[in-house]
Amino acid sequence: MKEPKVSVGVMFEPKIEFILNSGFICNGAEYSGLQSVKLSGGKIEWLGKVFDELIFEPADGSISSFELKDVTIGINFHWERKENQLFKGSLKFIVEGEKITAINLLGVEEYLTSVISSEMSATASLELLKAHAVISRSWLLAQIDKNIEITNSSEKYSTMTESEGELIRWYDREDHTRFDICADDHCQRYQGITRASTPIVMDAIGQTRGELLMSEGKICDARYSKSCGGVFEEFQYCWEDKKYPYLVKQRDSKSDTIIPDLTVEKNAVEWIKESPESFCNTTDNKVLSQVLNNYDQETVNFYRWSVKYSQKELSQLILKRSGTDYGDILDLVPIERGTSGRLVKLKIVGTKRTRIIGKELEIRRTLSESHLYSSAFYVEKEMGSEQAPIAFTLKGAGWGHGVGLCQIGAAVMGEKGYNYKEILLHYFIGATINKMY
């Protein structure tokens, strides 16, 4: 197996400015310096001409780089912002809908160097970085294989089921059909060579080159999130109804392995109220700074957290985020939970409408201006003199979907002396680590 190439959708705008910092070849001629493309009649306008697509390939791949202006990072998250970003590899422009898409084409190992630097602090321990390199590589190649399967399947792939009383939707990277993955947290956080790559990041990539997590002869769909909250979630509760043997419930601990049945409401509430021992139950800034870049460190409470909304705030928020007018909110009723206590289905009861929503990310998006930390929460209502509650407090556990590697837990394991293979096999139960190229 040779090192694969990857295509990454970086930005989507009607007009894109970019700088070719050295010579790039396009349509047989060499260009450099400040350039601009814009949408014109469904095509790409550049230098007074229109094109269906454009590809800029580096004249000297070892030193060539390009810069994209005003790239949005953290799309729909609480720290969303724009920044200029620097990239190696080739640059491709295509038209999708009413926007131009900028795509970066490069080798998997070069891509991983950026992902590790973007997702993690470059000051993270070597073992944590090596574990993340194997996970990111595995996830990427598994998604490419999955996309090929979906493309070749006669069955239509759907990420949503909807009826009058229920909306169940999950979010995955399959809505990218013209490139492999996007550059934001929706897939893996990728910011080219904008973030500094230290020698330790390069070592982590090099020492694990070509290594993949495998299970039953296939590359593992190696998911990860910031904090599981103490128990791993299972794949089918967050995405399509498919079980993977390596993504199953387990305590994020070696000393305490007892797991209450968190699909039972009473048990889930008690679990969230507690703060049990787990690898990811830490407030150690040295450890947290390994996983959380500066903008992630704006989030302080993640293992256990709470959010309070007034009736007006919650009803307006749900209307804004879902597009559905429920009227005043009377109740938020848990219908189904996964193995970590995360809500899979939630009933929103309003004076105008009642509906069940899911899965976990749909719930998180509906109940927050960006993304609620997780769907592992219970609700406390504050009643007034009227029929509808005057306030709702959501008390929750963890940060993210909780499936696969828990980044903060893995950082703690690295600090405790576990090597990268031990870290990986703690979070991906029964998997193996194979060198494939």
Regions inferred by a protein language model and the residue ranges of each:
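Conserved, single-site charged/polar hotspot
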Residues: 1-437
